[in-house]
């Protein structure tokens, strides 16, 4: 007779299984395990007296004959594709298999072979997600990269050269010389990195040379002059070389209004940064473009979610970030035109219905690089409390809402920027850039961050202690953050044209250079998983009220948020 144990005892030993529910941090979001790939009674687990021992759950199979490098056991996978439990096998820095791990010589249904050369990571009671991607980075300070890594981000895309004033305001690495220096610098950091060139030009020559120098994308920013002519020129170069274009439109409406920008885009695919407008863009109605089928709209995290402090904070941030002076009335008017509680409130709802597709940081330039995940889940929690269950939900859980929101900082930015063949989801064949979370700390403080299958960061106690847990416990770089392991565990993304032109040999960098692809006509708003809605947006020019398909979008600011002070006492 098989031995029977209670669900509680089973969850305590092997983690939750099909039908069990897990609360995410201190939010009101509850996930339910949809499927468990294990064979009950044949689970593998590492430890004294446990299963992964020689002749038991560990086989004699060599790596050459199919054993994996690492197995993550009994993990709850939270991904855009579903919420399920499985073992994960890693090999050659990639996800080799998802399913049932063990010894095929004595266990049924094994598709992940554990051998003497296999390392074990205990996923029991843990959540595994794909590493996050932050697609709106001002590379102002290299220290941002460690901050982002420790928050669960494994890819950063943006522009800059350090604390130059152009970088403080705009996400552009201008010109081939600066792009080369940034690609060289990338070898020092445990992070997948990608750099954007400056897209503001009326003739294509300077833009073309930036793409050939390795830019994965081109950024149009109003501080450099986002005119209709510059928009058209930039998109034409992008179409020629298969790179994405990101746009920050003309707040002052000097060279045209939102309709003129839409006209200049001419139906071509484009990623619209901070589409609500507080981060910049046609005042007061840039938010309209989230209804365009060719526009991929995103948010930056300072407006996520709308709270009682959002408006006051933004005015001061904006003055600093855009080199404005509080003693100049025109500068104050410029700042005030961008900060509108009505459009920020509407942004919450547009995220919840899947009309906004991506959340990013805007690091040190009106955004916090370590809070992409936190702000995403705070928005999801606020919307559940204010709007209730989504109509797409099945069963007594929040699975669909969770899948919608995790897509905003994993798969969708990866698709938008031509990286989804490598990153963005927990999927066989993709890079093993994975994050383990204790559910109580989900989205706030990871348990472990893997880059290319190696541990790059984790909380760790006193290195002189007799065990790993004594205080002070804080995040520390792990072995994938050092030496050649660093350059073999992460990559730098570049354009295909730059690879074809011999960029790697020319720069002599150690990291693998990987080309972006399918950023233009092959994708659109419809490609944004769980976030592809294109409502018709109207903005009242006097009251700033926002309507989607005729429905007024409004909500109250939050006075209390989850995932906040409770988690940051020390």
From Swiss-Prot:
GO MF entry, a single one: nickel cation binding
Gene3D superfamilies membership: Metal-dependent hydrolases, Urease, subunit C, domain 1
Keyword Phosphoprotein: no
E.C. no: 3.5.1.5
One GO CC term, this protein: cytoplasm
Free-text description of this protein's post-translational modifications in UniProt: Carboxylation allows a single lysine to coordinate two nickel ions.
List of residues binding substrate: 221
List of residues that carry N6-carboxylysine: 219
Keywords: Cytoplasm, Hydrolase, Metal-binding, Nickel
Broad class of the protein's primary localization: cytoplasm
Domain Urease: 131-570
Catalyses which reaction(s): urea + 2 H2O + H(+) = hydrogencarbonate + 2 NH4(+)
Binding residues for Ni(2+) 2: 219, 248, 274
InterPro entries noted in UniProt: Amidohydro-rel (IPR006680), Metal-dep_hydrolase_composite (IPR011059), Metal_Hydrolase (IPR032466), Urease_alpha_N_dom (IPR011612), Urease_alpha_subunit (IPR050112), Urease_AS (IPR017950), Urease_asu (IPR005848), Urease_asu_c (IPR017951)
Residues the record lists as binding Ni(2+) 1: 136, 138, 219, 362
Active site per the UniProt annotation: 322
Subcellular localization: Cytoplasm
Biological pathway: Nitrogen metabolism; urea degradation; CO(2) and NH(3) from urea (urease route): step 1/1
Cofactor dependency: Ni cation
Family under the similarity heading: Belongs to the metallo-dependent hydrolases superfamily. Urease alpha subunit family.
Record note on quaternary structure: Heterotrimer of UreA (gamma), UreB (beta) and UreC (alpha) subunits. Three heterotrimers associate to form the active enzyme.
HAMAP family: Urease_alpha
Protein name per the record: Urease subunit alpha
Species this chain originates from: Rhizobium etli (strain CIAT 652)
């Amino acid at each position: 007779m098989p031995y029977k144990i209670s669900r509680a005892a089973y969850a305590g030993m092997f983690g939750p299984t099909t039908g069990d529910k897990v609360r995410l941090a201190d939010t009101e979001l509850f996930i339910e395990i949809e499927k468990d790939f294990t064979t009950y009674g044949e689970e593998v687990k590492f430890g004294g007296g446990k299963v992964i021992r020689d002749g038991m759950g560990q086989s004699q199979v060599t790596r050459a004959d199919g054993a994996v490098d690492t197995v993550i056991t009994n993990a709850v996978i939270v991904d855009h594709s579903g919420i399920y439990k499985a073992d994960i096998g890693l090999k050659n820095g990639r996800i080799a298999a998802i399913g049932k791990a063990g010894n095929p010589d004595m266990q049924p249904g094994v598709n992940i072979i554990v051998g003497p050369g296999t390392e074990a990571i205990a996923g029991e009671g843990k959540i595994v997600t794909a590493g996050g991607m932050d697609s709106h980075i001002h590379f102002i300070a290299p220290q941002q990269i460690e901050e982002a890594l420790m928050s669960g981000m494994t890819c950063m895309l943006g522009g800059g050269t350090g604390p130059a004033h152009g970088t403080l305001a705009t996400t552009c690495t201008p010109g081939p010389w600066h792009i080369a220096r940034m690609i060289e610098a990338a070898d020092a950091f445990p992070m997948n990195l990608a750099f954007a060139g400056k897209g503001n030009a009326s003739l294509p020559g300077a833009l073309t040379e930036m793409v050939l120098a390795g830019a994965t994308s081109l950024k149009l920013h109003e501080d450099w002059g986002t005119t209709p002519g510059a928009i058209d020129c930039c998109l034409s170069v992008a179409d020629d070389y298969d790179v994405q274009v990101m746009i920050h439109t003309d707040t002052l409406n000097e060279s045209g209004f939102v309709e003129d920008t839409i006209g200049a885009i001419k139906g071509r695919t484009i990623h619209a940064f901070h589409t609500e407008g507080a981060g910049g863009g046609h005042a007061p109605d840039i938010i309209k473009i989230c209804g365009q089928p060719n526009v991929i709209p995103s948010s930056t995290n300072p407006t996520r979610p709308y709270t009682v402090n959002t408006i006051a904070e933004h005015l001061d941030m904006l003055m600093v970030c855009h080199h404005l002076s509080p003693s100049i009335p025109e500068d104050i008017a410029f700042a005030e035109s961008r900060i509108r509680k009505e459009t920020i409130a509407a942004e919450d709802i547009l995220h919840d219905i899947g009309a906004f597709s991506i959340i990013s940081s805007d690091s040190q330039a009106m955004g916090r690089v370590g809070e992409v995940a936190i702000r995403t889940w705070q928005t999801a929690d606020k919307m559940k409390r204010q709007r209730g269950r989504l109509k797409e939900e099945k069963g007594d859980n929040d699975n669909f809402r969770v899948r919608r929101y995790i897509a905003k900082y994993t798969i969708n930015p990866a698709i938008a920027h031509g990286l989804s063949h490598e990153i963005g989801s927990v999927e066989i064949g993709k890079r093993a850039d994975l994050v383990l979370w204790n559910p109580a700390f989900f989205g706030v403080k990871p348990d472990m961050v893997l880059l290319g299958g190696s541990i790059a960061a984790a909380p760790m106690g006193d290195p002189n202690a007799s065990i790993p847990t004594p205080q002070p416990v804080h995040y520390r770089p792990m072995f994938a953050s050092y030496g050649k392991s660093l350059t073999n565990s992460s990559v730098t993304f570049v354009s295909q044209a730059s690879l074809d032109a011999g960029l790697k040999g020319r720069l002599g960098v150690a990291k693998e250079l990987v080309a972006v692809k399918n950023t233009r006509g092959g994708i659109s708003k419809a490609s944004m998983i769980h976030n592809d809605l294109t409502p018709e947006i109207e903005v009242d020019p006097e009251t700033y009220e926002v309507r989607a398909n005729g429905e007024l979008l409004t909500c109250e600011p939050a006075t209390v948020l989850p995932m906040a002070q409770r988690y940051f006492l020390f």
